[in-house]
Amino acid sequence: YEAVIDMYPLDFEEFLWANGIGETVIDSVKSCFENEKVVPDGIHKAMMELLYRYVIVGGLPEVVNCFLETKNVEFIYKVQRNLIAEYEEDMIKYAGGADKPNIRECFESIPKQLAKENKKFQYSIVKKGGRSSQYIGSIQWLEDAGIVRRCYNTRITELPLEGNSIKDCFKVYTTDIGILMAMLDYGTQADILKGNLLGYKGAIFENLMA
């Protein structure tokens, strides 16, 4: 008997565990949100610092381990860029011939997609004149590989959401927030640690929630 278990990057709560934050503190923060109470200043400041760290590190085990061992942003960035290079090698190795360049183009367009106030994925951002028929298979490949996830718009916000989704109206996010950060300009991570989100605030928090 075999059971298939899907593995995902660490979420923020799991990242807190990895950083030695106990359940008492986490439960206290949860209680504040559930009861609509103000989080104590000291805890709020610590949680915001950890959230910024989570944004730049993400939840991939190799990157989290690097962060815990070194606390060095440059080392973290190098590990993430190596992982991105491995993703791109897999695109060449495992994708069908016609899709190979399209997959990489779709993947590399994600920061630009999220930086704009678009309500859905724009194929013209991937390449001028780009069409759904040209790239939809590439997006599916990236999703099947666990590199990205799609979030669909809905006609109405009622359950079942999937039944009310608009299949040709979606946005694409990286499965791991740290990978998105590593795709941005070098130095962005150091700025985020200082609390300076620059022009990426919308993209960062959209991707976090996705």
Task: Show the residue positions of the predicted features.
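A short helix-turn-beta junction within AAA+ P-loop NTPase domains corresponding to the substrate/partner-engaging
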Residues: 1-13
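A generic structural signal for short hydrophobic patches within well-formed alpha-helices
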Residues: 12-15, 179-180
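Conserved AAA+ ATPase "sensor/coupling" helix adjacent to the nucleotide-binding pocket
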Residues: 1, 18-31
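Hydrophobic/aromatic beta-strand patches that form the interior of the parallel beta-sheet core
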Residues: 3-5, 55, 173
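Conserved AAA+ ATPase small/helical "lid" subdomain
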Residues: 28-77
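Short secondary-structure boundary/capping segments
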Residues: 4, 43, 163-164
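Accessory nucleic acid-recognition modules appended to NTPase machines
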Residues: 60, 64-210
